[in-house]
From Swiss-Prot:
GO terms for cellular component: cytoplasm. Its EC number is 3.4.11.9. The gene is AMPP. Catalyzes the removal of a penultimate prolyl residue from the N-termini of peptides. Its cofactor is Mn(2+). InterPro entries: Creatin/AminoP/Spt16_N, Creatinase/aminopeptidase-like, Creatinase_N, Pept_M24, Pept_M24B, Peptidase_M24_C, X-Pro_aminopeptidase_P. It comes from the Eukaryota. Pfam families: Creatinase_N (PF01321), Creatinase_N_2 (PF16189), Peptidase_M24 (PF00557), Peptidase_M24_C (PF16188). This is Probable Xaa-Pro aminopeptidase P. Binds 2 manganese ions per subunit. It is an enzyme of class 3 (hydrolase). Keywords: Aminopeptidase, Hydrolase, Manganese, Metal-binding, Metalloprotease, Protease.
């Protein structure tokens, strides 16, 4: 999501120091991806290497540094932010635009040949490394995986320490399933793949598997750990001091605890202890495509005979199981979104009144008030990402978030976009609403209405089992395309249950990965089409929806059919809707949705007359 601060950072000193190290290590290029050793999207501060070396702190991007140049690759969500943050040392590579290569293609297509390209082996996957090696070979360039991270050395004593915050047990009245039941299902999936073990590397998967939560990464209730599941044992690799007494008691004798740094020693011996032969058709240690090269080369050392491999890359059984919420989790999603809706109503009512009274409210101050209202809700555990509170042109910066020292004042005559969310013991929320507190311009109303039509198209979609989010993404864009408009981000991402607000493998968008995962009943995804006019405004309407089974008059092919249940409960501003563009079913959808919001949220606002009156007005039928 957003990242605080949009100032340019002078990176001359750190680049000079890095280049000196590169010369000592005999590498011509150093690659700095966004990810940490767990392939996390959002990072602990100690792992924000790309932000440290480049000054760009968006959540997606890759830095490529040569001995005389530096390049930052990122996607359309972050073009404007990167332009603001990068200094003159850097060239911004706008991935997705014509003739702009990916960073991987850049290394072998654009750079000279006969180069040594260095990267930390713990933050590149085996698959990516193999692809790079294959493409670099014709140019006689070489990938040099390193056991040390040169950026960490440059960062030195100023690098933040790795967090070791308390880890606690999430009660089964919220999780809906014991960790023993989850492990049993994982073992069944391991057996189907002729596996003898599965290495769990993703932090949200470790947390979900053991019904544990932490706070080692801001906004993400996870903790630094790995796990290995075999037919006979379950091992959790964690700093044991982080486990509180209740968590330790919950795991009991069923889980062996080893130090976080002991994983590699354990994996080195695992093929032997499992009596694996390494034969092509033999049993394997299962890993996912997001497992680091350092881990896979520990399991199957590069020195092994060519025909010998002790590991196999598979879809994560934990990720697939986690994506489908159980009945308890689904009910938690419904309830936490109703409570969240009350906080949103209180905030938007307060903000409107403040602006009408001529008070100055900065983007950051607004976000602080919204957090205050949320913090008063039952089961609140914190925000789920940095609030994107953006007025006018800042709304066009898709993942903008306000700098407390230097942000805009929210203006009545500008579009205001607010994308925010919270963590609760019973679920995770993520909601975007777009408002105008004055008189919107006709082009703003038309664009908003087109975005709304795309939102309704996804919300009301019906599709057969086996359909992917890749396939239905265009339904959200069709109405925008009719006006020659579009947006440079996905339509929806998976959402964790009191876990990461961005969850895979499910999603709605044009990423090829979304075509590999069919939408299934119980999955949770966002529905968030938008439109952004650079330098002027941004529009986005986002609800969280749950995939559900639907009963239809027919059932062609005996496939069974699916649809969506929206759980987000917050009005969509009717002032910004051109009702003449809507079909009758679309108008009915708006009115039905607003009636539902009123019925579910108004009982929670009986002690806030201002918010109650605001909600009544904003849910009036069109």
């Amino acid at each position: 999501m957003g990242a605080r601060g949009n100032h340019t950072v002078d990176t001359s000193k750190q680049l000079a120091a890095l280049r000196e190290l590169m010369k000592k290590e005999n590498v011509d290029v150093w690659v700095v991806p966004s990810e940490d050793q767990h392939y996390s999207e959002y990072l602990a501060h100690c792992d924000e290497r790309r932000a440290f070396i480049s000054g760009f702190n968006g959540s997606a991007g890759c830095a490529v540094i040569t001995l005389d140049k530096a390049y930052l690759f990122t996607d359309g969500r972050y073009f404007l932010q990167a332009e603001k943050q990068l200094d003159s040392n850097w060239t911004l590579m706008k991935q997705g635009l014509p003739d702009v290569p990916t960073w991987q293609d850049f290394l072998h297509k654009t750079l000279d040949g006969s180069l040594k390209i260095g990267i930390d082996a713990t933050i590149i996957t085996e698959e990516d490394a193999a692809g790079l090696r294959k493409n670099l070979a014709p140019k006689k360039s070489e990938l040099v995986p390193s056991k040390k991270n040169l950026v960490d050395i440059v960062w030195g004593s100023e690098r933040p320490a790795r967090p070791q915050n308390p880890v606690f047990h999430l009660d089964e009245k919220y999780s809906g399933q014991s960790f023993k039941e989850k492990v049993k299902k994982v073992r069944e999936e391991i057996a189907k793949e002729k596996g003898k073990a599965f290495v769990v590397t993703m932090l949200d998967e470790v947390a979900w598997l053991f019904n544990l939560r932490g706070s080692d990464i801001d906004y993400n209730p996870v903790f630094f750990a790995y796990a290995v599941v075999t037919p006979d044992e379950v091992v959790l690799f964690i700093n044991e001091k982080q486990l509180d007494d209740a968590a330790r008691d919950y795991l009991g004798q069923d889980v062996k605890i080893r130090g976080y740094d002991e994983l590699y020693d354990y994996l080195k011996e695992l093929p032997k202890s499992l009596s694996l032969t390494g034969d092509k058709d033999g049993e394997k240690i299962l890993v996912t495509s997001r497992t680091s090269l350092a881990i896979t080369e520990t399991i199957t050392p590069p020195s092994s005979p060519e025909s010998t491999t002790f590991h196999k890359v598979v879809r994560s059984p934990v990720g697939d199981l986690k994506a489908i919420k159980n009945a308890v989790e689904i009910e938690g999603f419904r309830q936490c979104h109703i409570r969240d809706g009350a906080a949103l109503a209180r905030y938007f009512a307060w903000l409107e009144e403040a602006l009408n009274e001529g008070k100055e409210v900065s983007e950051y101050a607004g976000a602080e008030v919204l957090e205050k209202y949320r913090s008063e809700l039952d089961l609140f555990r914190g925000l789920s990402f940095t609030t994107i509170s953006s007025t006018g042109p800042n709304g066009a910066i898709i993942h903008y978030s306000p700098d407390p020292q230097d942000c805009a004042i929210i203006k009545k005559d500008q579009v205001y976009l607010c994308d925010s969310g919270a963590q609760f013991s019973d679920g995770t929320t993520d909601v975007t609403r777009t408002w105008h507190f004055g008189t919107p311009r006709p082009e703003e109303v038309r664009a908003f209405t087109r975005v709304l039509q795309g939102h309704i198209a996804i919300d009301t979609a019906v599709f057969p089992n086996g359909t992917t989010g890749y396939l239905i993404d265009s339904w959200a864009r069709r109405s925008l395309w009719q006006d020659g408009l579009d947006y440079r981000h996905g339509t929806g991402h998976g959402v964790g249950h009191f876990l990461n607000v961005h969850e895979g493998p499910q999603g709605i968008g044009v990423r090829i990965a979304y075509n590999n995962t069919a939408l299934k009943a119980g999955m949770t995804v966002s529905n968030e089409p938008g439109y952004y006019e650079d330098g002027q405004y941004g529009i986005r309407i986002e609800n969280i929806v749950i995939v559900k089974e639907v009963k239809l008059p027919n059932n062609f092919g005996d496939k069974g059919y699916l649809g969506f249940e929206h759980v987000t409960m917050c009005p969509i501003q009717t002032k910004l809707i051109d009702a003449s563009l809507l079909t009758e079913p679309e108008k009915k959808w708006v009115n039905d949705y607003h009636q539902e919001v009123w019925q579910k949220v108004s009982p929670l606002l009986q002690n806030d007359k201002r918010a109650l009156e605001w909600l009544k007005r904003e849910t009036t039928p069109i």
